Amino acid sequence: MDKTVSQRLGQGTLHQKLKRIMEKSTILSNWTKESEEKMKFDFSCELYRMSTYSAFPRGVPVSERSLARAGFYYTGVNDKVKCFCCGLMLDNWKQGDSPVEKHRQFYPSCSFVQTLLSASLQSPSKNMSPVKSRFAHSSPLERGGIHSNLCSSPLNSRAVEDFSSRMDPCSYAMSTEEARFLTYSMWPLSFLSPAELARAGFYYIGPGDRVACFACGGKLSNWEPKDDAMSEHRRHFPHCPFLENTSETQRFSISNLSMQTHSARLRTFLYWPPSVPVQPEQLASAGFYYVDRNDDVKCFCCDGGLRCWEPGDDPWIEHAKWFPRCEFLIRMKGQEFVDEIQARYPHLLEQLLSTSDTPGEENADPTETVVHFGPGESSEDVVMMSTPVVKAALEMGFSRSLVRQTVQRQILATGENYRTVNDIVSVLLNAEDERREEEKERQTEEMASGDLSLIRKNRMALFQQLTHVLPILDNLLEASVITKQEHDIIRQKTQIPLQARELIDTVLVKGNAAANIFKNSLKEIDSTLYENLFVEKNMKYIPTEDVSGLSLEEQLRRLQEERTCKVCMDREVSIVFIPCGHLVVCQECAPSLRKCPICRGTIKGTVRTFLS
């Protein structure tokens, strides 16, 4: 039975007690001698997970033992724990919480928690000790040999070994694609790339062409030409948790399909300048290929370009530093790595994107939005737009705002302006193509929902003129378009203009259904405003009041009430979208968005802000 909170092991004695348990047990002692190094880093071992709780806060009303048994190890941050198998992180534990139940609730497809629940249903005793539970499952070899079978398909004599129900469901060390890719140094086949196998969840174990899945433990060998690693994985192990998670996410988009393999990227470095202090192998592994110009490279996935390499530069770090949304980067290194690098450079692009609440900007094309620099830097705009290369681009007829935006991005990314007319023209042509595609998408959306488009275009005017907020809010709740929590958050705002701002932005985020209810409600409760917005389409915006005369306390209170994420309606906003400049969502909600929920402009980058 679990110890209560008051019986928690002290920080200084936890490791000693675990050590004494291991020494007294002959089975455990022999096991640790044989696999001491594995246990040192193996989070799939419950004893090792237990040992991570030496610094766990004492006031948490959930025992370390129950957390470790549920698959969690301590991250070292407050009371946050992480599952060694599915990566789920939980914190803010409350009295009465069941770690296993919360694990099942938030990540039901986790193979470890499924195995745990299945075992608890089948076992007559629910209080098996964690040590006995861990070592009651001997290795497949100890139980009478490997369970294997040959596929019955006449087209494939693949050897299949299914350990999914007999072994630890995850290999922590192989949970990242990069770690799996590095195991293929002795891979014997040329027709099936290690990158494809690693992407499909397999790491190399040998002998021959034998590979294993890090999640379900399934093993495959006897690969043949034209085999697809992901398809074979799904065919032989359809219930693998890795495949279930993969099927729920979209396959990431690739900017340059011809450069998606490591070998293809490496071949581009044939004429790489020998004086550059970064090696082609490093760059190719990080997703970059050479563009045959100076030391310029591009990512095959996100199309991000880097140059001016210096001694000590790490391509992976630079990739995460400048292009944190790259899907190849996230898949290979993991979101934690990207977050860590971003945390090292919190003010890297802080001068970007100061958006203004003016009606002109609200109705402007998001792609035409100019990146604004801070006060006193306007002279730099003049300088960067006066080079012969930039002037030549302007003389060709490109939009001045588009050229200015393109040049600013180039300087922020590389530290220098464009060197040749060919370089800038190539980028401008691509930007114009993107703008045309986005315009088509916007027109399609506007045709599908003219009401939503009108609300979006008149957002600032509605902030000022909408006074009957609560009846509309109640109608949205009654129609289940918003939740009770979202309803209460807006209702609790201290002033009507703040309620109106939150309501309008929530309608824009929720989409057509919310816009329709907003329109019908407005027609009933404020016919004048309804006529101006939806019939005459003639909303007037009046410049906002100057709050500088208010007390600092009042200014702070107003700002605090405007800083709620418009998606989750819970956390504080912290992400600025590029290029539109809207600051409306938190760090947790931003990755799931492809378009800004306010202006519907395509999100081409993000900048994290730190509001004080």
Curated annotation (Swiss-Prot):
* InterPro entries tied to this protein: BIR_rpt (IPR001370), BIRC2-3-like_UBA (IPR048875), BIRC2/BIRC3_UBA (IPR041933), CARD (IPR001315), DEATH-like_dom_sf (IPR011029), IAP (IPR050784), Znf_RING (IPR001841)
A Gene Ontology molecular function term of the record: transcription coactivator activity
Q: Which residues carry this modification: Omega-N-methylarginine?
A: R143
Its keywords, alphabetically, are: Activator, Apoptosis, Cytoplasm, Metal-binding, Methylation, Nucleus, Phosphoprotein, Repeat, Transcription, Transcription regulation, Transferase, Ubl conjugation, Ubl conjugation pathway, Zinc, Zinc-finger
Q: What is its main location?
A: cytoplasm
Annotated coiled-coil segments of the chain: none
What catalytic activity is recorded? S-ubiquitinyl-[E2 ubiquitin-conjugating enzyme]-L-cysteine + [acceptor protein]-L-lysine = [E2 ubiquitin-conjugating enzyme]-L-cysteine + N(6)-ubiquitinyl-[acceptor protein]-L-lysine
What domain of life is recorded for the organism?
Eukaryota
Q: Which Pfam families match?
A: BIR, CARD, UBA_BIRC2-3, zf-C3HC4_3
**Any one of the GO CC terms:** XY body
> Which intervals hold the zinc fingers (RING-type)?
565-600
The record's comment on protein family reads: Belongs to the IAP family.
Domain remark in the UniProt entry: The BIR domains mediate nuclear localization.
Subunit architecture:
Interacts with DIABLO/SMAC and with PRSS25; these interactions inhibit apoptotic suppressor activity. Interacts with CASP9. Interacts (via BIR domains) with TRAF2; the interaction is required for IKBKE ubiquitination. Interacts with E2F1, RIPK1, RIPK2, RIPK3, RIPK4, BIRC5/survivin and USP19. Interacts with HSP90AB1. Interacts with several death receptors, inclusing FAS, TNFRSF10A and TNFRSF10B. Recruited to TNFRSF10B in the absence of receptor stimulation. When TNFRSF10B is stimulated, further recruited to the receptor and cleaved by caspases.
Its biological purpose is as follows: Multi-functional protein which regulates not only caspases and apoptosis, but also modulates inflammatory signaling and immunity, mitogenic kinase signaling, and cell proliferation, as well as cell invasion and metastasis. Acts as an E3 ubiquitin-protein ligase regulating NF-kappa-B signaling and regulates both canonical and non-canonical NF-kappa-B signaling by acting in opposite directions: acts as a positive regulator of the canonical pathway and suppresses constitutive activation of non-canonical NF-kappa-B signaling.
Entry protein name: Baculoviral IAP repeat-containing protein 2
| Phylogenetic placement of the source organism | Eukaryota, Metazoa, Chordata, Craniata, Vertebrata
Q: Quick one: which gene encodes this?
A: Birc2
